[in-house]
C-alpha cells in the first residue's frame, strides 16, 4: 500500500454509485455503514490480497464473504474457467459438469444423497423451506435468533447479519402473514426448542440453523446442542436442516456435519462450491429430494442453475481442497491469527473473546463466552468501527461489520499473519490511549 492512505478514487466512485444504486451498493454490508466510513472500491484481487482503485493493497480476510478458500483468482480455477468459456457461458440445458460436481458433493457431505443446484444461498434456503413443508405437510419452521438464511421474507425474523449490521428491526415489506409460521429460539438453547415443539404439536415442518453462526459473528455450538436438535426433530416427525452455505467445505471437506458428526435431513450450500461464481445448492435424503420437480410435485426452477462456469469453478475448487494437508494448514494459520488478535487486545486492556475452526474465525469486543445472539450484541460496535478503519490504513481488510465471521485462505502466508498481527497490536495500542 502507499505511504499516505488515500482513498479518493474509491470515494468518487462510491459517491457516483449512490445516484445509481440504492445506498450505492448491490448488498447492504458493503456500504460500510456499520463502521461509519465510506467503502473501499476494489479494482482486482489475487491470492490473499485485494487492491483498491487508489492502488492500496490489503491482506483480505473477507474472501468475497467466504468463497475464496483457495485464494482469489487461483491459477488452476482461472485456467479451468478459460477453457470452459470457449464452450459457452450458459446452456439452459443439462450439462455434464453438473453430474461431476453433484458426485463430488454427494461423496463429501454425509446428509446428501441427491442434490439440486441453484444460483445463491438465499435461493437454496427458499427451496429447502418449501421442500420441508411439502414433505411433512406442515407449515411451521423453527429458526434461531441471529442465524441468517438469506433475504427471503419468511427468514427475515431475528435474522442477524445485515439486519444487525444496520441496526434495523426486521425488514419493512414483509407481511405478518408470511412470518407467522416462523418460530424463533435462542441459539444453543435446547430447552427453548423443546418448548416450541410442545406448544406446536404436529405443526413444525423442521428446524433450520447455521451449525456455526457466521452471520452474527462467530458462535460455535455447545457440546450436545446439535445432537439434541437431531433427537428432537426425529421425536417430533420434523426435519433438521443445516444451512452450510458458509460452513460447507469451509471448516472441513464434509462441512460442519462432517466435523461434528451430526447428520441432518437436508443441507443448503453455496459460496465455496462455486469457486467464486454465483451458486447455491440444496440436498439431502433421497426420499425427500425425490419430491423436487420434475421427479416430484414440489416446483423449483432456475434459468442459470447448473451453468457450466459455476460448475467448472466448483469442481476445480473441490479438487484443490482434496489435496493432503489443506484443512490442517487452514486451521494452523487461522488459530495463530485469532490467538494473536486476542492476546494483543488483552495486553492493551481491551475486553475480547474469539475463536476459530479451520479457515473461519471471529471475535467480539466484550467479555466471553458468547453463546447466542443476545450475548453477541454486547460487543463494542463503536470500537470495532474505529478498529476497522485503523486496520484498513495499515493494509488489512476485515469484514465491515462486528457481526460477520472472517475467513482465511490457502493463499495466506505466515508472513501475512505476521503483518496482520503487527497491525492489530499497533491499532489496539493506539486506540487504547
From Swiss-Prot:
Associated pathway: Porphyrin-containing compound metabolism; protoporphyrin-IX biosynthesis; 5-aminolevulinate from L-glutamyl-tRNA(Glu): step 2/2; Porphyrin-containing compound metabolism; chlorophyll biosynthesis
Subcellular location: Cytoplasm
Keywords: Chlorophyll biosynthesis, Cytoplasm, Isomerase, Porphyrin biosynthesis, Pyridoxal phosphate
Presence of the UniProt keyword Isomerase in the record: yes
Domain of life: Bacteria
N6-(pyridoxal phosphate)lysine modifications at: 271
GO cellular component terms attached to this protein's record: cytoplasm
EC code: 5.4.3.8
Pfam families: Aminotran_3
GO biological process, one term: chlorophyll biosynthetic process
Family: Belongs to the class-III pyridoxal-phosphate-dependent aminotransferase family. HemL subfamily.
Subunit structure: Homodimer.
Protein name: Glutamate-1-semialdehyde 2,1-aminomutase
Organism: Prochlorococcus marinus (strain SARG / CCMP1375 / SS120)
Lineage: Bacteria, Bacillati, Cyanobacteriota, Cyanophyceae, Synechococcales
